A protein has these predicted regions:
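SH3-family beta-barrel domains
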Residues: 18-36, 44-52, 57-100, 105-135, ...
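Bacterial N-terminal signal peptides
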Residues: 5-15
């Protein structure tokens, strides 16, 4: 019986798919200060600019522990974070494509650390994004961080 329960739990965890995917938020309307503890009296570590994607690790009253694109863990005031999704380009340079296919025409080229808005979350290995200049298209999800 115990082995059956373990097998069921393991199958459930493996089948979670997108439901178990990481949760992300973005830095709100202004720059967000990241702290080493959940308090404004804690040591200030650094600041992230508007729109920067942050992975949610833990939420406690008024605070969210986040991970940035470099893997650094810090605390942010939850009121300073926005549910709007953004991603950072990780590849040296990639083309935003008209359709989710490697042979689709390019709409724009973007370089590492460019911030893009998420139009549609990743599906089939591609994510639909929007550049601040208005260009909209698809990138491979592996080429960005934040989804």
């Amino acid at each position: 019986m115990r082995l059956l329960l373990i097998a069921v739990a393991l199958a459930s965890a493996l089948g979670a798919g997108r439901a178990g995917a990481a949760e992300f938020r973005s830095a709100g309307e202004s720059a967000v200060i990241l702290y080493d503890a959940p308090s404004v009296k804690a040591r200030k570590l650094y600041i992230v600019n508007h729109g920067y994607p942050l992975e949610v690790m833990v939420q406690v009253e008024g605070w969210i522990k986040v991970r940035d694109a470099t893997g650094t863990l810090a605390w942010a005031e939850s009121r300073m974070l926005n549910p709007a999704r953004t991603v950072l380009v990780r590849a040296a340079a990639v083309n935003i494509r008209q359709k989710p296919a490697d042979d689709a025409p390019s709409v724009a080229e973007v370089r590492r650390d460019v911030l893009l808005g998420v139009v549609e979350p990743a599906a089939g290995g591609w994510i639909q994004v929007r550049h601040r200049d208005g260009a909209t298209g698809y990138l491979r999800a592996a080429d960005v961080w934040g989804d």
